[in-house]
Amino acid sequence: MPAANELSATQLVAAVTSGALRVVDIAQAVIARIEARDGEVQAFAHFDKEALLRQAEALDRAPVKGPLHGVPLGIKDVFNTRDMPTAHNSPRYAGSRPGVDAAAVDTLRAAGALLVGKTVTTEFAATLRGGKTRNPHDPARTPGGSSSGSAASVADFQTTIALGTQTGGSTIRPGSFNGVYAMKPTWNSISREGFKMGTISADTVGLYARTAEDLALLADVFDLDALEGPMPVTLAGARVAICRTPVWPKAQPEVHAAMTQAEAALRAAGAVVSDLDLPEIFARFADAQARIHARETRSTFLNEYRTTPDLHEEFKARVEHRDAPAAAELREAYKLVDICRALFDDIAAAYDVILTPSATGEAPLGQDKTGDASFNSMWTLLQVPVVNVPGFHGPAGMPVGLSLVARRYEDRKVIAYAGLAGTLFAAEAGA
């Protein structure tokens, strides 16, 4: 049997329920992995092994609490936690202990999850400036961001599942760079109470796992909307659209190759594949999104601006509204986004899922920046469910993920197809 920290959530729950593993065994395996790898990966902003062992012992003494009993969970350090600090990677909140769990954390704790620690985020999850976390596949490269530590901890077997957030591409892009399943659910389908938001109309709780089956388990825990039809069990006959989006010129050769391989594999598996060119109005979406982001982050960071003398210049600029859109421009931006949301729901109804890039390429070298969110941002503000599906690799041997997208509230369908596509992509890439 693999080490406990290498098992999936589904396997761990079965092992704990049958008595084959104790939660303490799982905790000890996690501790050993973190101690062996933390010097290189640095996924955690807060980790207390003694507290983790006490928590594991308490779970072993208790009856099975729920569907995640004993499953190691990483929590992005923008979520409030009652028994760990929540610092947002900012001097403003260093040592802060809210004393209460964010709603998503509370839900996972009630389901029996083993809370390993707080994972590294970029400051306030609102900047492209890199943090201390390194990509576990190559420490010279970024793990992406802002959910840097969550993605890296899952990829490196330090956690089994993890919480992230997404304003632009903060869950999906790290999923691609680290080679794990990553999900941005339908906007607000998981409560956002108790985490620091940047853009209110976009920010979404994100999920990480190493298998699509584990994403489905998390969907159960968070009671995501049920499938409207039968569960997909094959790609044969599936209606798949290939959408390169208006930012396709940014795609690097490895993304071109992955999309080409994926399309060929889907056709060979019997899927009905067609190209999807979005209407012209979507070419104006990025500009509208930038205007909305500028205005909403001004409100988000106003309190820090007024109470924190050493707030980073990037956040000062946002609050001071130095690049502010005029009121009329802002109203037009919201109007365009509303039109695109309704239009996309109608367009996507013709397909089961839409295949699109997760990132512009492999994880870039260096730690100064966390990468480009261009292929993620539109889907985030459209508020639709997205799953990064791992499987392909670029010329440096680094992971290259692709995303599956569907209409709002079709989260479980996307997860089901992600599982089928993930198996196919891994076989196609020889993983």
Give the role of each language-model region.
Residues V100-A219, L382-H393, P399-G401:
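Short glycine/serine-rich loop segments
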Residues A20-Q28, E57-D60, P253-D277, L302-R306, ...:
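Acyltransferase
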Residues G19, V30, G70, A110, ...:
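Glycine-rich, small-residue loops and helix-cap segments
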Residues P85-G95, Q252-P253, A363-T370:
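Glycine/threonine-rich flexible loop motifs
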Residues M1-E50, R267-G270, A429-A431:
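An N-terminal boundary/leader segment
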Residues L52-R54, R61-G130:
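Acidic/His- and Gly-rich active-site-bordering loop/insert found
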Residues K184-E263, F425-A431:
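A short helix-breaking turn/cap at a secondary-structure junction
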Residues L68-H88, G237-R239, R291-D345, P390-G401:
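Short helix-loop capping/hinge segments that flank enzyme active sites or metal/cofactor-binding pockets
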